[in-house]
């Protein structure tokens, strides 16, 4: 048998996958730390007891208790809620449902969350970027100039990694610009830290608005992998066509329903209050630390700061077991590190380590 045209397994893969640089999640980047402040997780574990013992049966595609509890919490109808394996799956579902590979494009505004780009690339959909303005708000003219052929626009508010809210009037302008042309996805992964800024009340006005949510941040359930997509029923029905038949395991659905009970939501709000208090403590301390050039305002559970020698600071803390998130390679974030708000003890360790840095 001739082997002249034999391809390696890698050669058999799609070209865009061979060339793909995967998203560098906090866990992929690794480290041997004992102070993990690089993934915007809640710093302490929350305990739940499993109540469902039907693991011999397949779960519901969209568990009723989870959907109803989340709809009540978010102030929308159950028909406007889809639950998935984290908000990351929601990103992928929207692209798969609305974008033709090789024809349509997505658009996002760096510096922002990296999975919009990676998800589009794996599916073979063009990625367009319109960098944010100097104040990290939307460049509406730039977006308008790039809408031809764009099917989905991703906006993260509060934005990761910068921490600020997108101007609501700019969001309205964007929704008007895209009406009848493109889907606008508002990523609200951190909205529990500034609930007054949610766009859920806008769903009735904008049939092309999609909102992403998660239990990974304020609900302290990053290990659960449970996220939500909020949209009008027509959009949800389209997403249900492309979602896996059993996206949530029975234990995940069980814990999610408990987390979204009245007691669970009250506990989440207590965690938010605790995080906001610790965030202010960390901001004040960073502002009085010599190696810190600037601390940016935050509406989230993390702080972005610019350092005089960020690479040295990052490595020095890494070597001490304090793992931060390096944002140097993001557009306009030269010298910046992102610090998750931890416990008081963790925050103090960060400050002590930073104040020991040479300037």
Curated annotation (Swiss-Prot):
Its EC number is 2.6.1.9. InterPro entries: Aminotrans_II_pyridoxalP_BS (IPR001917), Aminotransferase_I/II_large (IPR004839), HisP_aminotrans (IPR005861), PyrdxlP-dep_Trfase (IPR015424), PyrdxlP-dep_Trfase_major (IPR015421), PyrdxlP-dep_Trfase_small (IPR015422). The keyword Protein biosynthesis does not apply. Keywords: Amino-acid biosynthesis, Aminotransferase, Histidine biosynthesis, Pyridoxal phosphate, Transferase. Pfam families: Aminotran_1_2. One of its GO terms (biological process) is L-histidine biosynthetic process. It catalyses: L-histidinol phosphate + 2-oxoglutarate = 3-(imidazol-4-yl)-2-oxopropyl phosphate + L-glutamate. NCBIfam families: hisC. It comes from the Bacteria. SUPFAM superfamilies: PLP-dependent transferases (SSF53383). Homodimer. One of its GO terms (molecular function) is pyridoxal phosphate binding. Pathway: Amino-acid biosynthesis; L-histidine biosynthesis; L-histidine from 5-phospho-alpha-D-ribose 1-diphosphate: step 7/9. Signal peptide: none annotated. CDD domains: AAT_like. The keyword Amino-acid biosynthesis applies. The lineage of its organism: Bacteria, Pseudomonadati, Pseudomonadota, Gammaproteobacteria, Enterobacterales. It comes from Salmonella paratyphi C (strain RKS4594). Its cofactor is pyridoxal 5'-phosphate. The modification N6-(pyridoxal phosphate)lysine is found at residue 217. It is an enzyme of class 2 (transferase). Belongs to the class-II pyridoxal-phosphate-dependent aminotransferase family. Histidinol-phosphate aminotransferase subfamily. This is Histidinol-phosphate aminotransferase.
